[in-house]
Amino acid sequence: MNLSATEKDLMIVNMGPHHPSMHGVLRLIVTLDGEDVVDCEPILGYLHRGMEKIAENRTIIQYLPYVTRWDYLATMFTEAITVNGPEQLGNIQVPKRASYIRVIMLELSRIASHLLWLGPFMADIGAQTPFFYIFRERELVYDLFEAATGMRMMHNYFRIGGVAADLPYGWLDKCLDFCDYFLTGIVEYQKLITRNPIFLERVEGIGVIGGEEAINWGLSGPMLRASGIKWDLRKVDHYECYDEFDWEIQWQKEGDSLARYLVRISEMTESIKIIQQALEGIPGGPYENLEIRCFDRERDPEWNDFEYRFISKKPSPTFELPRQELYARMEAPKGELGIFLIGDQSGFPWRWKIRPPGFINLQILPQLVKRMKLADIMTILGSIDIIMGEVDR
């Protein structure tokens, strides 16, 4: 192969799949001319587990524990979209109390996800101290999750028609205490990071995406809102009970890594506002719509037989998906998380297509890093916020 004089000096570097700044098993084949990036090719699939095919061989109830392994840092959202699709398909009403509980859990999960984005992002660009601070607040969120669901991660809490269990006694007060404390933590981050001249030097003007370009690439979430597009599915689709709360879409117009950082920091403050309003206005009533549980009616148990006395021996609830198709979506921390669902009058979905926000947002990476310095790859990739579990599925 005949190489030109300039091409002979190019160097090909493999970043990942075990590089700490790759945020999982992502591999980048980077072509360098000195310190300048000439080309970048992401290699995906190291964490592919066949999540869509697994869904087509399980009932919705059986599949719920699997979905927390997509985006394993924002598991409430993967559970929510998994039950929202069948609920819309079957026109199932969710009790008001269950909807409020869902909103509280989703916004707490958004905060936890943004916190675990912020710490490693700062570590990627050389600031180690905030990495330890974010774990302090994140532990408090996980303590709340553990008290309500029994699990710190992989909660398996959402159900078709509601949630698995009501909130325990005293949980609402503890959550309100956390909200008050966390607002002071955000002020601390602002002082420590936002006005830091070294941090600003690393992120300002790096990885700029224009508004029209962001739409053409199909970007969503903070990636889209940081480019000047005020688009948030909580306002657009009016799902759950977000319309009952007073909050604003957070956006920036610069489109660089700093803008994406500012959007996520502001979103945490808005999430606290939503949680506080939900905690103060949460109604009483049931936490699950039990009428939709279609039990096996063939064996009608006698009042005194073994099946009747031992509730654990009840048949498993199965929900038949109507013969329809549907695209359900919601605003996850990383962007638009959606599923395309086709039912065929059986307990198993005929098709279950996942639309992961991280996978779509990652597609613009090669374009963003071209003509940048090698060290800027970590900044740009960190600002995109990916989790390989949902990218590879």
Curated annotation (Swiss-Prot):
The organism of origin for this protein: Gossypium hirsutum (Upland cotton)
GO biological process, one term: photosynthesis, light reaction
Upper taxonomic lineage: Eukaryota, Viridiplantae, Streptophyta, Embryophyta, Tracheophyta
Name of the coding gene: ndhH
Subcellular location field: Plastid, Chloroplast thylakoid membrane
Catalytic activity: a plastoquinone + NADH + (n+1) H(+)(in) = a plastoquinol + NAD(+) + n H(+)(out); a plastoquinone + NADPH + (n+1) H(+)(in) = a plastoquinol + NADP(+) + n H(+)(out)
Membrane topology: Peripheral membrane protein
Pfam families: Complex1_49kDa
Protein role: NDH shuttles electrons from NAD(P)H:plastoquinone, via FMN and iron-sulfur (Fe-S) centers, to quinones in the photosynthetic chain and possibly in a chloroplast respiratory chain. The immediate electron acceptor for the enzyme in this species is believed to be plastoquinone. Couples the redox reaction to proton translocation, and thus conserves the redox energy in a proton gradient.
Oligomer and partners: NDH is composed of at least 16 different subunits, 5 of which are encoded in the nucleus.
Annotated keywords: Chloroplast, Membrane, NAD, NADP, Plastid, Plastoquinone, Quinone, Thylakoid, Translocase, Transport
PANTHER family for this protein: NADH DEHYDROGENASE [UBIQUINONE] IRON-SULFUR PROTEIN 2, MITOCHONDRIAL (PTHR11993:SF10), NADH-UBIQUINONE OXIDOREDUCTASE 49 KDA SUBUNIT (PTHR11993)
E.C. number: 7.1.1.-
GO cellular component: chloroplast thylakoid membrane
Transmembrane segments: none
Cystine connections: none
Taxonomic superkingdom: Eukaryota
GO molecular function: NAD binding; oxidoreductase activity, acting on NAD(P)H, quinone or similar compound as acceptor; quinone binding
Protein's UniProt name: NAD(P)H-quinone oxidoreductase subunit H, chloroplastic
The family this protein is said to belong to: Belongs to the complex I 49 kDa subunit family.
Main location, first listed in the record: plastid
